[in-house]
């Protein structure tokens, strides 16, 4: 069964590109035609590229990797948070803070501070402080939550990132490329395909298109997680099998050696009349 159908792509408006005067010539090979001054994206190619991206994401996650979801434009914010949360992956849907990837050690310290403030609030750590101190701590916590909440459980840089609108998320793209982190992204007609490892030609401005393609990536993550869980269960079952004691191993080795000798003896014995 196809990951997504042509009808779903058409219904979401994934085929609509930008106006013909706002385009990147490198995207020419992904364009089917133009109508009324708007480029129409070749959805047949989109389907092919979706399959490639889906397989990459699934395999990456199955082997223990993680995918960061990035989309801070209004049209993408909701679906980015919703789909990433559904599959337990980190996401950025507010503002990309410089160094989120390239200076993760510093970002990780801010995450620790966020958790520290949350723990203080929940365990009564704010009690006994002045109203001004409580207000300052609460503001600090809310600010950290807003900017870092989506990556609160991220322990290291992701294995790959999913991006909605590479032009808007140019900082995230630049950091990922600097660290050689693979980029999966929607490629609208004004984007640069050379910056993306796993492109999906499509409309990155329509809410439904961004949501559909983000859901596809999340589904690939979910399938990868299932494969990872299955592999883990098989490994656990193998490790759980109780090893043979030394005397049992010797007995088994003796039985294995004795069997061929007995068979040879029977073959050499003369028949009795």
UniProtKB/Swiss-Prot annotation:
This is Small ribosomal subunit protein uS2. Belongs to the universal ribosomal protein uS2 family. It holds the Pfam family Ribosomal_S2. PANTHER family: 30S RIBOSOMAL PROTEIN S2 PROKARYOTIC AND ORGANELLAR, SMALL RIBOSOMAL SUBUNIT PROTEIN US2M. Disulfide bonds: none annotated. GO terms for biological process: translation. InterPro entries: Ribosomal_uS2, Ribosomal_uS2_bac/mit/plastid, Ribosomal_uS2_CS, Ribosomal_uS2_flav_dom_sf. PROSITE patterns: RIBOSOMAL_S2_1. GO terms for molecular function: structural constituent of ribosome.
């Amino acid at each position: 069964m196809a990951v997504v159908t042509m009808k779903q792509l058409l219904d979401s408006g994934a085929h609509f590109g930008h106006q013909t005067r706002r385009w990147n010539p490198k995207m020419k090979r992904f364009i089917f035609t133009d109508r009324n001054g708007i480029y129409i994206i070749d959805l047949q190619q989109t389907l092919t590229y979706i399959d490639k991206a889906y397989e990459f994401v699934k395999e990456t996650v199955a082997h223990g990797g993680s995918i960061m979801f990035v989309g801070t434009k209004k049209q993408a914010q909701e679906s980015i948070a919703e789909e990433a949360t559904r599959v337990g992956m980190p996401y950025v849907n507010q503002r990309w803070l410089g160094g989120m990837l390239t200076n993760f050690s510093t970002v990780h310290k801010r995450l620790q501070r966020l958790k520290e403030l949350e723990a203080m609030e929940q365990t009564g750590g704010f009690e006994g402080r002045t109203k001004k101190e409580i207000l300052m701590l609460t503001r600090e916590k809310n600010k950290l939550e807003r900017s870092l909440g989506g990556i609160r459980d991220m322990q290291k840089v992701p294995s790959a990132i999913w991006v909605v609108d590479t032009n808007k998320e140019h900082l995230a793209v630049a950091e990922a490329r600097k660290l050689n982190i693979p980029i999966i992204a929607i490629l609208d007609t004004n984007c640069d395909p050379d910056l993306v490892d796993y492109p999906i030609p499509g409309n990155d401005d329509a809410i439904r298109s961004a949501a559909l393609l983000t859901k596809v990536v999340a589904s690939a993550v979910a399938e990868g997680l299932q494969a990872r869980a299955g592999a883990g269960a098989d490994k656990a079952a193998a490790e759980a099998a109780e090893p043979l004691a030394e005397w049992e191993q010797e007995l088994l080795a003796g039985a294995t050696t004795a069997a061929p000798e007995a068979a040879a003896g029977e073959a050499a014995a003369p028949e009795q009349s």
